[in-house]
Amino acid sequence: MAEPVRLGRKRPLPVCPNPLFVRWLTEWRDEAASRGRHTRFVFQKALRSLQRYPLPLRNGKEAKILQHFGDRLCRMLDERLKEHLASGGDHAPSSPSGKKRASKGPPAQVQGSSMPVPTQPQAGSTNAGYWPAQNSGAREILLQLYREHLNSDGHSFLTKEELLQKCAQKTPRVVPESSRPWPALRGLLHRNLVLRTHRPARYALTPEGLELAQKLAEAEGLSTLNTAFQPEEHHEESPVPEAILSEPGTTEVGVQQRPLELRPSEYRVLLCVDIGETRGAGHRPEMLRELQRLRVPHTVRKLHVGDFVWVAQETRPRDPERPGELVLDHIVERKRLDDLCSSIIDGRFREQKFRLKRCGLGHRIYLVEEHGSVQNLSLPESTLLQAVTNTQVIDGFFVKRTMDIKESAGYLALLTKGLERLYQGHTLHSRPWGTPGDAESEAKPSTNPLCSLLTFSDFNAEAVKNKAQSVREVFARQLMQVRGLSGEKAAALVDRYSTPASLLAAYDACATTKEQEMLLSTVKCGRLQRNLGPALSRTLYQLYCSHSPLT
């Protein structure tokens, strides 16, 4: 006789063996996300790795065996564990079987230490163990919605404008100054703690969010909110930026940041080195060793354009973790001869120069570094010399040639000292992107452009290579793929025909094929206002009007 089929699970799903560590990593990730820091990705990777690990961990040091757990993160877990125990946390260890040990039992000891292991609460749902960090954006949103829920005269919901205005009044620093949609609100929506309805959007607490908000209110001594509710005063001097009021997931737009002023004794000049200069095979890390040997104050960052820039960094910032920084008006692109050859061949050479011209900095330096024998390169020396000469004469860059990496580092050290002397005694001011003083702006330059500078966040954000582009920008990039069509010529073409559709319409309006071929030949290009010429005009006609394969 066949055995009856058993339905359902044979055993319950295993509980999380390290819920305390999961909760703390989640808090750190959400706090980093609410402040727009890239460390949220580090915490997210570590959290995924920990959630896949089936065994309990007694301390942070044991977590080092897991992927994405470094020395610093392990130390953070150990320090948080000590704080938890010092504040009277439960000392009973978690059990792999999920059964709780009797409360009278002796506390377990951490391996190699006399410190007992705290009980880590079991996670029963997706939000189990989630506790927004103190002064974080997520915490303030939940508390503001809880206040509105308890207000008998309210609607139990807030619009986004009302919500963020209240958050800005209560804790101004939790409202980000970046141009991205507020990640704290997006995270709460993802966790199903906040519900969004209607258009324009209304935000209210879900049952899970209400339960968590009540616990947060009790922890902050706000249990009497329902009897002592007072509306927030309106402060006109601290409006919420419009970009923050956009819906989560909308396109990124510029934000008018708070003006930054650095007096002569309030900043230092710091060299920023692109992270690409510290990676890869060969002698790339040697640049950092040379800068350290020469005692050049520097930092390594991801630069979206250029290899070296200088910033005036605030020495006594309000937020030590995010000091104010203004980018000085100098940028360096470093090229070894072998890299110069490859960039000319694959087209990066022209594109990089085009992006450097649009970066907003006025003094552009092209640092060409010798490397090996010229005879071993893929292009003849005359071609390289012509490219470097064009960069200086036509593009207006300052070209500096060095023999090796040591001479390049020495040149950067001299530039750093020179900039320190140049800006000594000057008061520096921030300016928004595209305002007078910007190298890309057509407006009249400001009276003191030397001290009217971009913030580092604006500079790096505008230089992002793969950001969303308009049709005009994509059209210009497409035109630059044609041999002999430089950035200046592409700019002249898109000034007359801003989209491919407008160019095709102009071709359709021509009476004869000859007229179509010569349509673009008289377009004025560059500073000398020379004609584009019949050859390029004919090439572009063939590209956009030929129905057969190009030959």
Swiss-Prot record:
EC number: 3.1.22.-
SUPFAM superfamilies: DNA polymerase beta, N-terminal domain-like, Restriction endonuclease-like
Residues covered by region (Helix-hairpin-helix (2HhH)): 471-545
Location of the region described as Disordered in the Swiss-Prot/TrEMBL record: 85-131, 231-255
Catalytic center residues: D274, E277, D307
SMART domains: ERCC4
Location relative to the cell: Nucleus, Nucleolus
ERCC4 domain residues: 270-372
Binding site for Mg(2+) 2: E277, D307, E333, R334
Modified positions (Phosphoserine) in chain numbering: S95
Compositional bias annotation for Polar residues: 110-131
Keywords: DNA damage, DNA recombination, DNA repair, Endonuclease, Hydrolase, Magnesium, Metal-binding, Nuclease, Nucleus, Phosphoprotein
Region (Interaction with BLM): 124-243
A GO MF term: metal ion binding
Coiled coil residues, start to end: none
Cofactor(s) named in the record: Mg(2+)
Binding residues for Mg(2+) 1: D274, E277, D307, E333
PANTHER family: CLASS II CROSSOVER JUNCTION ENDONUCLEASE MUS81 (PTHR13451), CROSSOVER JUNCTION ENDONUCLEASE MUS81 (PTHR13451:SF0)
Similarity comment: family membership: Belongs to the XPF family.
Function, in words: Catalytic subunit of two functionally distinct, structure-specific, heterodimeric DNA endonucleases MUS81-EME1 and MUS81-EME2 that are involved in the maintenance of genome stability. Both endonucleases have essentially the same substrate specificity though MUS81-EME2 is more active than its MUS81-EME1 counterpart. Both cleave 3'-flaps and nicked Holliday junctions, and exhibit limited endonuclease activity with 5' flaps and nicked double-stranded DNAs. MUS81-EME2 which is active during the replication of DNA is more specifically involved in replication fork processing.
Protein name: Structure-specific endonuclease subunit MUS81
UniProt source species: Rattus norvegicus (Rat)
Upper lineage: Eukaryota, Metazoa, Chordata, Craniata, Vertebrata
